[in-house]
């Protein structure tokens, strides 16, 4: 590979990492500000959890559109549209804040989610088609770039929310999305193989080797979405930690995801994705049980942050690489769309249920509910098909 080609690939990975970061940042703004938003809008945890569930469901459903759309019009164009319109949608949050309306907040969040939903299946399809060597490692680097940017988001969001109003935190990241959209399109060429007939959702569901992965992915989504929304508030209400330190704890969890993404990608290329997924599933279970059961709460929180941060994020490049390996190139967008729908869409149901359990029985009950799905994911990880996809990278 020439230096020019290598430099171009590095720029492409950096841009994808930035896009990945902003895509996730839009949805980690609310958790550290949740108490402030609920108080400002006058709603309960069940209501805010219900709104988050609807937005997350659309975030998942939109992936069913984003994947095939990327196969048809090009991943680069699809990602540009995603960034531009999800960024513009954040400005509606200012209206929600002024009107103190949960309904306007819901409109803003669902529009953000709908446009942002195009990103994940499209980006993973683009990576699997553009980078032919060490796909899992590249997936990991893409994740590292995304997580690095997201790491500071909870604290930045908290700072802006407390000092200027929670809506301005959304607007800042929306502006960054718009600026990145303006520079994204020209840095990616048309992917080879676009003339092939693109796959459909039905075609994706016919790939029998993917069914075990799909069910495993649903279990992951059912604990992930609840933890993502309620972890900072859990620390505030059940562990007596103030909002600033709860935001810092959430930031640290994301920070441990940076080495997690890199480790997961490297390990999947070396030993195969199945072993990585079993190990990371066990790590997630250890983290949640430590948070709930260790009598010294601060120790439990530290164990949770380290183990969950590394384990959860390490599973992503391994799972994404294996999914791409088992999928025909012309169907990868559709396949990734199905996978992100099951993870983010179906998984979003846990946000409403966890919010209801927290209101009715307390946050411990909600987190035991989420832990049950982590244990199910661990059991299912042993059923994932073995594959030699890592040999392609050696």
Model-predicted regions and their roles:
Residues 84-99, 283-296:
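C-terminal ends and interior cores of transmembrane alpha-helices
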Residues 72-83, 270-281:
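Cytoplasmic membrane-interface "Motif A"-like loop-to-helix N-cap segments
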Residues 30-31, 209-258:
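Extracytoplasmic gate region of multi-pass secondary transporters
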Residues 324-360:
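A late C-terminal transmembrane helix in Major Facilitator Superfamily
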Residues 108-146:
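Cytoplasmic helix-loop-helix junction between adjacent transmembrane helices
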Residues 28, 56-64, 150-151, 254-262, ...:
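Residue-level signature of mid-helix packing/kink "hotspots" within the transmembrane helices
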Residues 273-322:
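C-terminal transmembrane helical hairpin of 12-TM major facilitator-type secondary transporters
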Residues 133, 142-188:
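Helix-loop-helix hairpin linking two adjacent transmembrane segments in secondary transporters
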């Amino acid at each position: 590979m020439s230096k020019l080609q290598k430099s171009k690939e590095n720029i492409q990975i950096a841009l994808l990492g930035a896009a990945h970061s902003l895509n996730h940042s839009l949805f980690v703004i609310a958790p550290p500000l949740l108490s402030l938003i609920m108080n400002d809008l006058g709603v309960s945890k069940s209501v805010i959890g219900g709104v988050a569930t609807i937005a997350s469901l659309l975030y998942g459903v939109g992936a069913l559109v984003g994947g095939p759309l990327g196969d048809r019009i090009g991943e680069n164009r699809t990602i540009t549209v995603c960034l531009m319109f999800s960024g513009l949608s954040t400005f509606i949050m200012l209206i929600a804040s002024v009107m103190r309306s949960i309904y306007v907040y819901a409109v803003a969040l669902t529009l953000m989610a709908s446009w942002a939903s195009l990103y994940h299946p499209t980006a993973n399809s683009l990576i699997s088609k553009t980078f032919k060597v060490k796909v899992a490692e590249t997936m990991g680097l893409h994740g590292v770039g995304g997580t690095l940017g997201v790491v500071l988001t909870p604290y930045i969001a908290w700072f802006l929310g407390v000092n200027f109003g929670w809506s301005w935190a959304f607007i800042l990241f929306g502006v960054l999305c718009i600026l990145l959209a303006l520079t994204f399109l020209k840095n990616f060429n048309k992917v080879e193989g676009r003339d092939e007939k693109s796959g459909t959702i039905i075609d994706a569901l016919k790939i029998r080797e993917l069914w075990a992965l799909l069910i495993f992915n649903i279990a992951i989504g059912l604990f992930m979405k609840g933890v993502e929304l309620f972890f900072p508030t859990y620390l505030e209400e059940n562990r007596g930690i103030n909002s600033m330190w709860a935001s810092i704890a959430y930031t640290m969890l994301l920070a441990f995801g940076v080495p997690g993404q890199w480790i997961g990608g490297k390990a999947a290329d070396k030993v195969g994705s199945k072993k990585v997924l079993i190990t990371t599933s066990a790590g997630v279970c250890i983290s949640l049980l430590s948070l709930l059961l260790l009598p010294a709460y601060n120790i439990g929180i530290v164990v949770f942050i380290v183990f969950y941060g590394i384990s959860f994020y390490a599973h992503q490049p391994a799972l994404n690489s294996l999914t791409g390996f088992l999928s025909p190139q012309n169907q990868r967008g559709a396949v990734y769309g199905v996978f992100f729908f099951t993870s983010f869409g179906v998984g979003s149901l846990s946000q409403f249920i966890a919010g209801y359990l927290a209101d009715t029985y307390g946050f411990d009950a909600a987190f035991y509910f989420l832990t049950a799905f982590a244990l199910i994911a661990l059991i299912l990880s042993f059923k994932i098909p073995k594959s030699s996809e890592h040999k392609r990278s050696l």
